[in-house]
Amino acid sequence: MKNTILILFTAFIALLGFFGMSAEALADLKADPLAGPNPDADPEAINLKAIAALAKKLLG
């Protein structure tokens, strides 16, 4: 059960990250696609490392 929840949570975060990156790439046409997200372009960007750390802490 714990593994199923972790897999679903990880998939959900991955989808959020994918669509967030796509929206940012469309908004900033001059951005380098290999440079990663630009925190200045999206002040409400999801901090995936913090979410992953929280999930790891909560789930063991």
Swiss-Prot record:
Entry-annotated residues carrying Leucine amide: 59
GO BP terms, alphabetized: defense response to bacterium; defense response to fungus; innate immune response; killing of cells of another organism
Signal peptide positions on this chain: 1-25
Residues making up the propeptide: 26-45
GO cellular component, one term: extracellular region
Source domain of life: Eukaryota
Designated name of the protein: Mastoparan-VT1
Upper classification of the organism: Eukaryota, Metazoa, Ecdysozoa, Arthropoda, Hexapoda
